[in-house]
Amino acid sequence: MKKLLILPLALFLLVQSGLAQTPKWVEKAKRAVFSVITYDKNDKMLNTGNGFFVSEDGLALSDYSLFKGAERAVIVTAEGKQMPVSLILGADDMYDVIKFRVAITEKKVPSLVVATTAPATGADAWMLPYSTQKSIACVSGKVKDVSKIAGEYHYYTLSMQMKDKMVSCPVMNAEGQVFGISQKSSGADTVTTCYAAGAAFAMSQKISALSLGDVALKNIGIRKGLPEAEDQALVYLFMASTQMSADEYEKLLDDFIRQFPSSTDGYIRRANYYVAKGKDDQSYFDKAVADFNQALKVAAKKDDVYYNIAKLIYGYQLSKPETTYKDWTYDTALKNLRQAMAIDPLPVYTQLEGDILFAQQDYAGALAAYEKVNASNLASAASFFSAAKTKELLKADAKEVLALMDSCIARCPQPVTANFAPYLLERAQMYMNNDQARNAMLDYDAYYKAVNGQVNDLFYYYREQAALKARQYQRALDDIVKAVELSPKDLTYRAEHAVVNLRVGRYEESMKILNEILKDEPKYGEAYRLLGLCQIQLKKTDEACGNFNKAKELGDPNVDELIKKYCK
């Protein structure tokens, strides 16, 4: 009987000893630990695991594996309350950690303090499991080894037994601060040893400007947060605008404004987004106006906001809306722009002033603005091109227009690159309009080189016209053959091919081409006229006059003089 009493007494003393060693902070700290449930794209349960809060406003840590492939996630607190995971804020798939935000349903939640220093080898450690019961049960052990990861952070080997359901539970130091996130053991040492990634390392995970390309983050379908620094967040926004769906991008804009409420950039970008949506629903324009008004309220430099309002309205008018929204006219754009210029007359504002005046067909006013820009440090190929086109519309002397185009080309990278190559085409056309065909050919050749020969049939046709005018007949012939090759059904190219052959005295070849055209299109009047010209050269006047009369019947406007000359 005495032996039977001894065993329960020994067990009682052992339990009392264990309870005595449990730190006082455990009961409170355990309330910060929660269960995590993740769901896949079909809304089926994907994984379950643990995590814990590290701030009262819902910042939390767990393991990356739990979230991989998840489209949504919820947490269940120690009190049994469910809350959704709202944002992923950073992850590392190598060390299997993730930082995220929970959309908490209370003013604040119980949270743990992350230790700022690593515990020493041999220090006491406690692992806090998730539990919905009021219990101070925890697993105690020692820090067996501390190793460095990612420079200043740590990874821990613990002399501690751990069960599978305790992965991603917090590992605490004697002061009740979390220093590690428990990780699954493997191999022969699972009975006595487990591991923990540093909590400080998990906290260091963040979204950067380039995180849109991060494979680990892309494997999670839950929304991502923004970078903490505003400049990085702006780059992230810019990249997201072309990679996200419209709805996702709108939510991201909302997040940016919540995170940086005093930044005008968020309101301006969202206003531009709303205007794009306004093509289908004009109520979005009201939202854009509200955002611009808020931007003006928070702006330290209001001129930038006025400039962006002007630019947006100008772009809106350029799209030629069927009905104009309220007072969103070129005049309103100009009014906002001049408010910006009154605060700070920056050359970029003057450039937009010129563009708006140009759109209003006030070419004299536009030219005055462009000339101001060209005299400033903002002078560029684009500003000189704008001035050249405006002078051309004002019927200015061709030499003045070409001088401006020369300045435009001079401000392009040399040799001219593909992005600037269209300016060469513009100058080539101006040369052609002013009977400078050889100069036009040089620009066409420079364009061909700038775009690495990536040209179409129209380019070859234009260069052929220049070569023909410059009496470079072989080049003209080569280019028109190439144009026909690229677009064999185009009658203009085929007729031009006949013209070049006619010019170089290849009358039979020209007639062959023209007869093939008439086989495909019997009512093509120009072909009859050209056929007649070939026959005149071959002294076949009667046949030529028959073709001239056929061209006249079909409405060719250029045949009357030929009939007068050869057929009377």
Describe each model-derived feature in a short phrase.
Residues Q21-T22, Y39-D57, D63, Q82-P84, ...:
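A conserved glycine-rich beta-strand in the N-terminal activation segment of trypsin-fold
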Residues N272, A276-K279, K311, L318, ...:
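Residue-level recognition of tetratricopeptide repeat
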